[in-house]
Swiss-Prot record:
Primary location class: membrane
Protein family membership: Belongs to the UPF0756 family.
UniProt cross-references to HAMAP family, sorted A to Z: UPF0756 (MF_01874)
Protein name: UPF0756 membrane protein BPUM_2558
One GO CC term, this protein: plasma membrane
Pfam families attached to this UniProt entry: DUF441 (PF04284)
Annotated organism of origin: Bacillus pumilus (strain SAFR-032)
Keywords for this protein: Cell membrane, Membrane, Transmembrane, Transmembrane helix
Keyword Cell wall biogenesis/degradation on entry: no
Length: 154
């Protein structure tokens, strides 16, 4: 029962409790619960392979709720395109999506980078009250930085 993985999860739970980070508390508790009831061999591979896509889908649904409720409509869209901030947000959205695209490739092809990114995300979430939406974006930024290092060093 006292495996390295379990010890790591308990340590993360303690850090999450100290940092009062509800998202990390819930995430670690769910993983510990799945392990305790013995479904980890079946559920973890699915969570690992599909979880990011599910998370992006849930975030997308949450972002689209104001459209579904009618709080945001064509009138607000028309008003937004007149705002310089809206154009900045549009550009940022495009840029982040393109950066994240490269992040997926990096995460799939370089497991030790995945470990560093996940640990960085855990630190940011637990210690700095960050939000764990960053692994794809973080991987994309890491990919761009690696390409820049390659370009300038060789």
């Amino acid at each position: 029962m006292f495996t390295q993985a379990n010890l790591f999860l308990v340590l993360l739970l303690v850090i999450a409790l100290i940092a009062k980070n509800n998202s990390l508390i819930l995430a670690v508790s769910v993983l510990i619960g799945i392990k305790l009831i013995g479904l980890d061999q079946k559920i973890f591979p699915v969570l690992q392979s599909k979880g990011i896509n599910w998370g992006v889908t849930v975030i997308t649904i949450a972002v689209l709720v104001p459209i579904a409720t009618g709080d945001i409509g064509f009138k607000q869209l028309g008003e937004a395109v007149k705002s310089s901030y809206a154009w900045i947000a549009l550009g940022a959205g495009i840029l982040v999506a393109l950066i994240a695209k490269n992040g997926i490739v990096l995460l799939e092809n370089d497991p030790h980078i995945t470990t560093a990114l996940v640990f960085g995300t855990i630190l940011a979430v637990s210690l700095f009250k960050g939000v764990a939406v960053g692994p794809l974006i973080g991987a994309g930024i890491a990919y761009l930085a690696m390409q820049a290092v390659k370009f300038f060093s060789g």
